[in-house]
Amino acid sequence: MRGIAYMKIIDITRELFSAEVFPGDPRPEANRIMSISNDAVCNLTSVSMCVHNATHIDAPFHFIDIGYGVDAIDLEKCYGKALVVECNDDSIDSGFITSKVPIGVKRLLVKGRATFTADGAEESVKRGMVLVGVENQSVAVAHDCQSAHKVLLESEVVILEGLKLDAVGEGEYTLCAFPLKMRDLDGSPCRAVLIQE
């Protein structure tokens, strides 16, 4: 039909209970409190989890003791044009950013298991990015989990971790990935989607 734009929504969120768990973090658990099958009026479930399980957003407080919590994140950073690029190396360093990411990109999602080095994070900040996302459960390289986190969070860059980008091609999309409103917490699960027009 003329005048109606085609729009496809791509879910890039990992299922909470089956997703990889970062070493040392608790696994999420669901507890059925009430059940219709046991003559209750409804089904009711409580969930116990780490706020960094599955697909989630890091707040500055995660690595900065005086940083703000996830409820204070600027939501405008979590919605808008985003570039998906693939990295076949182990790390996302400044060389990768300068060679693969055009100037002006504000939201960068990296496909693959790569994580950011400190200089890759610094180059992202220098370019004015407001959000970076990875498929790994941590944005930072394993041998130095603090540096990239601190560089990004001190500059109020939103960190989106645990994405599912295997079925997503490289290119530009509209990203929508909002944290839950939980006061002063260091992170939050989120439902992340890409909109392809």
Each language-model region and where it sits:
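Active-/binding-site microenvironments in catalytic and ligand-binding cores
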Residues: 2-197
